[in-house]
Amino acid sequence: MQIILLEKVANLGNLGEVVRVRDGYARNFLIPQKKARRATDAALKEFEARRAELEKVQAEKLAAAQALAERLNGFQLKISQKAGVDGRLFGSVTNADVAEGLRKAGFEAVEKSQVRMPNGQIKAVGEYPVQAVLHADVVADVVVLVEGEMA
């Protein structure tokens, strides 16, 4: 399926590019998320008419993401979980837990889908690096400090 990208999409293209993707990817993800629309003649004409407006919106989103990343870079998030005497957690700390902790710390714009945990879920007490992908071009590094509570 041919689509027009309405914003920058990682590993696919930039705003305004016409690309070919699988039908399911377009119908189930890109179009419902308002990241793309079908590349018909009418849609191409409408896009060219609205191009400046869409570029302005993209620039605003990028600026907001960069401002949030400046505040978020190097931030140390403390999470307490029940743990055994050997330091292993009962359960684990997931990206949803990290996103919730960041929201409570005043970073409301961070969603769980934006949190990347390079080593997977955290299952022991300690310090762990985590990334928050705020925009296709903006990534913030956060340190998660997991403290154990005696069960």
Swiss-Prot record:
Family: Belongs to the bacterial ribosomal protein bL9 family.
GO cellular component: ribonucleoprotein complex; ribosome
HAMAP family given in the database record: Ribosomal_bL9
Keyword rRNA-binding (UniProt): yes
Name this polypeptide is given: Large ribosomal subunit protein bL9
Gene: rplI
Annotated InterPro entries: Ribosomal_bL9 (IPR000244), Ribosomal_bL9/RNase_H1_N (IPR009027), Ribosomal_bL9_bac/chp (IPR020594), Ribosomal_bL9_C (IPR020069), Ribosomal_bL9_C_sf (IPR036791), Ribosomal_bL9_N (IPR020070), Ribosomal_bL9_N_sf (IPR036935)
Gene Ontology terms for molecular function: rRNA binding; structural constituent of ribosome
GO biological process: translation
PANTHER family on file: 50S RIBOSOMAL PROTEIN L9
Alphabetically ordered keywords of this record: Ribonucleoprotein, Ribosomal protein, RNA-binding, rRNA-binding
Role noted for this protein: Binds to the 23S rRNA.
